[in-house]
């Protein structure tokens, strides 16, 4: 479990199925869980503060980790320990899908089919960052980014068109399957 409070940014040393990340942590253990841009991964190999993680097909399909390039930044958070404070919300690291950034800056607007399961003022994890949903509309949602979030996380540098990992808060998401009616669907249908 995680909180969505990013501890630091890491740098991709080697992309791919055996993802290598410079974490800045020298005290990680083999088998430890780390959220990498919101995705719960298990430490497979350590060399100083460089860590390797194995990515399976489902991870590559559901997340943006397969699109990472050498030198890219990722958000990092270590797993909760008993007695830690819960400053964000409970995050499993089980990304449900991705969204596309359509507006960035002090607010972030993301298009995704998962919006149908969201509620305003509910929590969401975007690339591992715990955020409060400001607004929900068909096929999209908006969150506000405070200065510390823009400074510490990758969201302060995210560009329009980028894919971001999304995990809905299990306590506030709406039940049911997301609607397949998106802006693109409506546009193609002539609306």
Where are these regions (language model features)?
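Conserved loop->alpha-helix
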Residues: 1-191
């Amino acid at each position: 479990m995680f909180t969505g409070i990013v501890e630091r940014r890491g740098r991709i040393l080697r992309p791919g199925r055996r993802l290598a990340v410079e974490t800045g942590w020298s005290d990680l253990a083999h088998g430890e869980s780390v959220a990498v841009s919101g995705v719960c991964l298990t430490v497979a190999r350590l060399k100083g503060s460089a860590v390797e993680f194995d990515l399976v097909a489902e991870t590559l399909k559901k997340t943006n980790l397969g699109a990472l390039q050498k030198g890219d930044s990722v958000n990092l958070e270590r797993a909760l320990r008993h007695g830690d404070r819960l400053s964000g919300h409970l995050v499993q690291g089980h990304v449900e899908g991705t969204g596309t950034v359509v507006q960035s800056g002090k607010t972030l607007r993301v298009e995704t089919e998962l919006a149908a399961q969201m509620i305003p003022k509910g929590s969401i994890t975007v690339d591992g960052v715990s955020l409060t949903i400001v607004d929900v509309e068909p096929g999209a949602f908006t969150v506000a980014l405070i200065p510390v979030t823009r400074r510490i996380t990758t969201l302060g540098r995210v560009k329009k068109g980028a894919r971001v990992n999304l995990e809905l808060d299990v306590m506030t998401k709406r039940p049911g399957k997301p609607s397949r009616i998106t802006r693109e669907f409506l546009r193609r249908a002539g609306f």
